[in-house]
């Protein structure tokens, strides 16, 4: 059995070699000749999987180590009798921590408290729901918009997008990309919505580039209306609008979900799915794969306030480390993908062991995903 894996999928070689022969290949473009001699294909979001890629090949299973699946023609795979698995939620924590890193940076720069802001979350799936939980743990007001969930009668106080635009100081998008249909998200943030955002609002897109109309966003920024913007995703990736990048506060190369933990979760989820597909079910404990974090443990004295949370969060991951490299190479062909391929190791908050002498601080840090313990001062 031969399994093709994207060369940038961590732990793929060591896991899939338990099941058969493994060949690591580039994800964009996939070498077509390799597909004619393989049984399974494991990809990331850079690989478009459809009839033109796989028709006439012996591939009988496709796994994507990503939560999103808009790069995969699932209907055709089903019709062709090809097994498929994605990794829902694998990088949700990473995206939440990216959003926090950006918000804490903007709050410090502009001198505001997040507790005085209302945060509108558009799309309340794996990412949006975790973001809401952490924000509410900090006492920050959230408004939720998720029409498909509201229509299903899911529990939650779901508002309309209109209400969020009127009330929210921060609007953050965490939807899939649907190009048509009743819940179309293509240009969900269109010219009208962007024009109606409150002066001084913050717009964050860390889901899929075309959810926000990039031309309309640039027009508003060029008009000089106060708006802070954080973009991790762009229309037309890997090409992006360089003028828009120059106008936003934080711009990164579609890496919000790129923690070591998130990538490892993605790989293990598709590995477990494929092992079950071939009747050799296996489970993998994530901690057996991950290396020891850079920071062993730190000690925190006193309560947890916003500046302290910012220091802890940025000790693990400061979003600015990914903003500067993109600005340096923007517009140079191939560089966007190179930043993703050669991405510096990044960990999640859970990798930081925090000893607190304040019991409330320890409990709150645990709710936020840190590995915190109460250790009374003697």
From Swiss-Prot:
Spell out the Pfam families in the cross-references. 2-Hacid_dh (PF00389), 2-Hacid_dh_C (PF02826), DUF3410 (PF11890)
Catalytic site positions: 208, 237, 254 (proton donor)
Q: Name one GO molecular function term.
A: protein dimerization activity
Cross-referenced SUPFAM superfamilies, in alphabetical order?
Formate/glycerate dehydrogenase catalytic domain-like (SSF52283), NAD(P)-binding Rossmann-fold domains (SSF51735)
Class of the enzyme per the UniProt entry, highest EC level: oxidoreductase
Q: Gene3D superfamilies from the entry?
A: 3.30.1370.170, NAD(P)-binding Rossmann-like Domain
Per UniProt, where does substrate bind?
A: 45, 66, 258
- Catalytic reactions on record: 4-phospho-D-erythronate + NAD(+) = (R)-3-hydroxy-2-oxo-4-phosphooxybutanoate + NADH + H(+)
At the top level, the lineage of the source is: Bacteria
Q: How is this protein annotated for GO cellular component?
A: cytosol
Q: Where does NAD(+) bind?
A: 146, 175, 232, 257
Q: Which UniProt keywords apply?
A: Cytoplasm, NAD, Oxidoreductase, Pyridoxine biosynthesis
Pathway participation: Cofactor biosynthesis; pyridoxine 5'-phosphate biosynthesis; pyridoxine 5'-phosphate from D-erythrose 4-phosphate: step 2/5
**Gene Ontology BP terms:** 'de novo' pyridoxal 5'-phosphate biosynthetic process; pyridoxine biosynthetic process
EC number(s) in its UniProt entry? 1.1.1.290
Its function? Catalyzes the oxidation of erythronate-4-phosphate to 3-hydroxy-2-oxo-4-phosphonooxybutanoate.
- PANTHER family given in the database record: FORMATE DEHYDROGENASE 1 (PTHR42938:SF9)
Instruction: Report the family membership.
Output: Belongs to the D-isomer specific 2-hydroxyacid dehydrogenase family. PdxB subfamily.
How the protein assembles, per its UniProt entry? Homodimer.
The molecule here is called Erythronate-4-phosphate dehydrogenase
Q: Which organism is it from?
A: Salmonella typhimurium (strain LT2 / SGSC1412 / ATCC 700720)
Q: Which gene encodes it?
A: pdxB
